[in-house]
């Protein structure tokens, strides 16, 4: 259930447990939104506002060290599969920040939508890294995030360099 997933996220003792619980909560919330709607289109889509509310609640339950800001939300209809992939990618990026930049003093997530696009930006002020230094056999950054999003038409970018923190950008445009 949604409440059980959120409680599990709040009480988890490791980053992996928090990530799994937060993902579960987001999926449960978006499914609930989808099932509750009587609009046939909503069975395959979720509003950007519902997605942002779900993400914000799950992130805030998961960590008090992450600021979440929503900018000018326009209620855009987003394919359900795209919304879930963006939510999972957001949690993976936050998990990477928590695990690999534990000394970061700032983590921010900005959620924005326009008439035809949706954007999620995750920024930390950790030590940063070079993408080329991530071993090719690591699935997290390259496969789990970039490949999955790209197959759904979501652009994914990571800007980072040593001493500069990391900025993840996930952007989807409506056809």
Predicted regions span which residues?
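Conserved short strand/loop->alpha-helix "switch" segment adjacent to the catalytic nucleotide/phosphoryl-transfer site
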Residues: 65-90
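ATP phosphate-binding glycine-rich loop and adjacent ATP-lid/helix-beta elements
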Residues: 133-162
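Conserved phosphate/oxyanion-binding catalytic-loop motifs
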Residues: 93
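Acidic ATP/Mg2+-coordinating residue in the GHKL
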Residues: 124
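DHp/HisKA dimerization-phosphotransfer hairpin of two-component histidine kinases
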Residues: 1-69
């Amino acid at each position: 259930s949604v409440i059980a997933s959120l409680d599990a996220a709040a009480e988890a003792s490791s980053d992996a447990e928090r990530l799994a619980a937060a993902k579960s909560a987001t999926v449960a919330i978006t499914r609930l939104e989808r099932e509750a709607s009587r609009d046939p289109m909503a069975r395959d889509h979720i509003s950007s506002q519902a997605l942002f509310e779900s993400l914000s609640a799950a992130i805030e339950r998961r960590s008090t060290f992450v600021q979440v800001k929503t900018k000018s939300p326009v209620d855009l209809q987003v394919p359900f599969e795209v919304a879930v992939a963006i939510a999972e990618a957001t949690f993976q990026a936050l998990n990477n920040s928590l695990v690999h930049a534990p000394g970061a003093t700032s983590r921010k997530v900005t959620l924005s939508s326009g008439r035809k696009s949706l954007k999620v930006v995750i920024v930390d002020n950790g030590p940063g890294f070079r993408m080329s230094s991530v071993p090719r056999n690591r699935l997290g950054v390259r496969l789990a995030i970039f490949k999955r999003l790209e197959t759904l038409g979501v652009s994914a970018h990571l800007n980072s360099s040593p001493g500069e923190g990391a900025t993840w950008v996930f952007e989807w445009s409506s056809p």
